[in-house]
C-alpha cells in the first residue's frame, strides 16, 4: 500500500537547518586561528615544501612582524592516512583577530616585492607550487578546552 505524505510532513523545516550545538563565535578583538591544509601530488611533497618555505613562509614572517599574525606553525602527519583524508602539510596561523584573518593585508604586495626583487622568478616558482598542489582548504578553528 502506497502512503501519500503531504509536503509539509516531508519538507525540511528552517528550524532543522540550524547547526546543532554550534560552537560560540570568537569575541571581537580576540585571537582567531585558521588551519590551512595542503595536499600535494605524490612524489612532490619535498618540492612543494621547499617552494613554500622559499616563497610563502617569508611573507608570513613579515606579516607576523607587523602584529597581524601572533603565531605560526607548520606540521606534517607522522603516519599515512587514507587517500581521501590525506593532507601533507598543515599551517596553523593564529591571527590578532577575525577581522585581520579575513581581510587582505595592505602590505603583502610590498613585502613580496621587497623579498623577491626578481618577480618573474617568484611568479614562476609560485606557479609551480600550485601546479603540484592537488587540494588546499582553510579551516577556522576555535579552542574550546574548559578553563581550570
Feature roles, as predicted:
Residues 77-79:
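A cross-kingdom feature marking solvent-exposed beta-strand/loop segments within repeated
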Residues 28-43:
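Acidic/histidine-rich, surface-exposed loop or edge segments in extracytoplasmic proteins
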Residues 1-21:
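Sec-dependent N-terminal signal peptides of Gram-negative exported proteins
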Amino acid at each position: 500500500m502506497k502512503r501519500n505524505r503531504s509536503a509539509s510532513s516531508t519538507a525540511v523545516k528552517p528550524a532543522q537547518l540550524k547547526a546543532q550545538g554550534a560552537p560560540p563565535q570568537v569575541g571581537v578583538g580576540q585571537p582567531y586561528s585558521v588551519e590551512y591544509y595542503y595536499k600535494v601530488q605524490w612524489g612532490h611533497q619535498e618540492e612543494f615544501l621547499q617552494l613554500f618555505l622559499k616563497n610563502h613562509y617569508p611573507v608570513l614572517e613579515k606579516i607576523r612582524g607587523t602584529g597581524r599574525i601572533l603565531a605560526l606553525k607548520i606540521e606534517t602527519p607522522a603516519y599515512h592516512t587514507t587517500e581521501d583524508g590525506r593532507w601533507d602539510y598543515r599551517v596553523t596561523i593564529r591571527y590578532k583577530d577575525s577581522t585581520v584573518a579575513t581581510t587582505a593585508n595592505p602590505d603583502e604586495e610590498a613585502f613580496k616585492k621587497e623579498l623577491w626583487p626578481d618577480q618573474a622568478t617568484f611568479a614562476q616558482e609560485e606557479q609551480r607550487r600550485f601546479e603540484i598542489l592537488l587540494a588546499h582548504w582553510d579551516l577556522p578553528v576555535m579552542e574550546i578546552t574548559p578553563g581550570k
